[in-house]
Amino acid sequence: MALASTAVNTDVTPPVQTFDLIMVGGGLVTCSSLSRQNCVPGSQFTADAKQTSVYRLTHSALERAFKHPSLSGLTAPQKTILLHASQQQGDAGSSLSYQAFYDAISAVEKDFLTDLNDQVYYALLDLLEDEQAITSGINRQEHVMLSATQNQYGAQIFSLFTQQALFKKQQRQPQAKRPLIAVVTASARDPFESIDFYTQVFEQAGADVIWLPLDSALQAAIAQQQCDQLPALREKIQGNVDRARLYPVATALQQSMCVSPDSLYQQLLNIDGLFLNGGDQRLTLSAWLTPQKKPSKALDIIKKRLQQHQIVIGGTSAGTAVMTAQYMVTGGTSHGALTYGVLAAEAPSERCEESHCQSDIPATAVTYSTAGGLGFFPFGVTDTHFSQRERQVRLFMLSALSENKLGFGVDENTALLVDLRNHTVSVVGEHGVWVVEQSHVTQTPLSYSGVMHYLTAGDNAKVDVVTQSLNHIQLLSADKTINKQADVKREFNAWVDKACVDGQNDIDLGQAKLIIKPQSQQECDQIKRNGQHYQNINIQLNLVNH
């Protein structure tokens, strides 16, 4: 299945640099009909483009939803609240944005939606989402205009991935002009929602594109020979319901591939690039593992092709986090790491920070899986949305617990390129990649220490797998600086700047004391010359009352 785009750039030139992985930190800014704020002024989409998700808060829509087994837990008073909200909306209730939908229900009962558990909350949204039909069987789709994106870093990363996929293909077919890229959207609770986005992005970047309907539900259905139970498995494992109503073609394709999984395996043997979307890395992982947590046949195929350098694998956000062979972070914040520690436990629902959910694990506590991820990236722990969400402390503390003591935190709209054959890494994109190495922890008193680097576009290094550190670090000319837009929280970098000026910077974090100390002033020269990248700066975190 490929959803075609009319604007396709066929001028794809293989790059000089070769790599096997492109690990994106999330936040790839792209112009689309759902993200018009990312488009150059004057960009126009056709009338059939999907502009937002729409919900029906009407009596008939609610009565239909109440009949679905997933809402059997709703009480009579809860149903009355929803029906009353629909009456208040009148005709307007037939087409509501999510915010209008939320406000309409909250006007009747303030905490109604936040008090619902995940299963009921998401089922309610899915059952009331409108198809936005254009004609019978054809619904509105998100439209992408890659070339109309104001901030071109994301478009360049998509194009770079496409170029590398073509390079891989030309090793087998020298005259090839277009690579075949497969998109797997298993990270999302609703894996059908972003199909249009990713297929159009890579088509416009110059590739032939297929969507592979591989997700946790499909993996379970194949393993258990329960293809007739796919909708129920989607609800149980992924947490989505009623998807065939909105995505009839995609759900039919998934059903067909479940019955004939050899077609999935053949496509995995044919593709030149594989891209994993963002969302929840636990969902991505379970899409590639059997219900017994063993590598699936699909994963075995991809790993073998990766080892033979026949394919390039990319991912964004969760798609990057899941690539690690080390501990896989699953949730939490730096503040949560300082307050509650780093826990080998199941992460609570992402709604816990804003809703009244019950969980033994605090909403902000850092959680991780000791089993690791898919194992594509062997060099360390991975983290994403890095500087934007100030995740330095959480990655530092988790890396100290991992086997190889290396951590890589990738900023948004930025990517880490990984050459597995030569053990080299390099950075492209708008911001940078924070690396912590030689990290370790002492228990009495509780203290973490390590060495950190911050690499930006054009910087590269070699990973020494014996010493578990970076060497041969090459920083691009200090004339270039990274983007300092307001959306990036630069407090940590400001602390490093001060350490470079004063020789050391002690920061009181409340629950801990952070000490940043350059190994020599030479390590700060790049910062002093108006750069933002740096290398070989010692970092120590002393926790109080632990």
Which residues does each PLM region occupy?
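C-terminal and late-domain segments of enzyme folds
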Residues: S5-P179, V184, R189-F197, F202-G206, ...
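Low-complexity, highly charged intrinsically disordered N-terminal segments
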Residues: V183, D196-T199, A207-I210, Y247, ...
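Short connector loops at secondary-structure junctions
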Residues: S187-D190, A207-P231
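A structured beta-alpha segment of the ubiquitous adenosine-cofactor-binding alpha/beta core
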Residues: A220-I222, E235-Q267
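A Trp-anchored, charged/polar loop motif used as the substrate-binding/catalytic surface
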Residues: V249-S263, K297-D300, C357-T364
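Catalytic-core regions built around general acid/base machinery
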Residues: S263, Q267, K294-H309
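Short acidic, glycine-rich surface-loop motifs adjacent to enzyme active sites
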Residues: L268-L289
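Catalytic nucleophile loop
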Residues: F275-G278, I301-I302, L306-Y327
